[in-house]
């Protein structure tokens, strides 16, 4: 179920204040965050946000196509190690 339009998108307050401060100064810095549930807003375009994936911070460069998505979508939490290739001893 989608979030109500009257509430607006969720963005962590500390993240939004850091982005607005960098925009006011005209700087581009990596912003570390643990807030995977925050929605990407147009103010964040051009910034690099390091999103925590449970083990480390994954740098995510925000582009125009990402607006409206959540930060956690771009920092995968699971690493896929491929299926075993050459184990044929169980076959006859």
Curated annotation (Swiss-Prot):
GO terms for cellular component: cytoplasm; small ribosomal subunit. The keyword tRNA-binding does not apply. It comes from the Bacteria. One of its GO terms (biological process) is translation. Pfam families: Ribosomal_S19. The keyword RNA-binding applies. One of its GO terms (molecular function) is rRNA binding. Disulfide bonds: none annotated. Keywords: Ribonucleoprotein, Ribosomal protein, RNA-binding, rRNA-binding. Protein S19 forms a complex with S13 that binds strongly to the 16S ribosomal RNA. Belongs to the universal ribosomal protein uS19 family. HAMAP family: Ribosomal_uS19. PANTHER family: RIBOSOMAL PROTEIN S19P FAMILY MEMBER, SMALL RIBOSOMAL SUBUNIT PROTEIN US19M. This is Small ribosomal subunit protein uS19. The lineage of its organism: Bacteria, Bacillati, Cyanobacteriota, Cyanophyceae, Gomontiellales.
């Amino acid at each position: 179920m989608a979030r109500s339009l009257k509430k607006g998108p969720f963005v962590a307050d500390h993240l939004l204040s850091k982005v607005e401060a960098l925009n006011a100064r005209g700087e581009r810095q990596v912003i570390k965050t643990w807030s995977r549930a925050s929605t990407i807003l147009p103010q964040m375009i051009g910034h690099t946000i390091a999103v925590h994936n449970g083990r480390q911070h994954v740098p995510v460069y925000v582009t125009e196509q990402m607006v409206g998505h959540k930060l956690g979508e771009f920092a995968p939490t699971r690493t896929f190690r491929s299926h075993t290739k050459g184990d044929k001893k169980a076959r006859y």
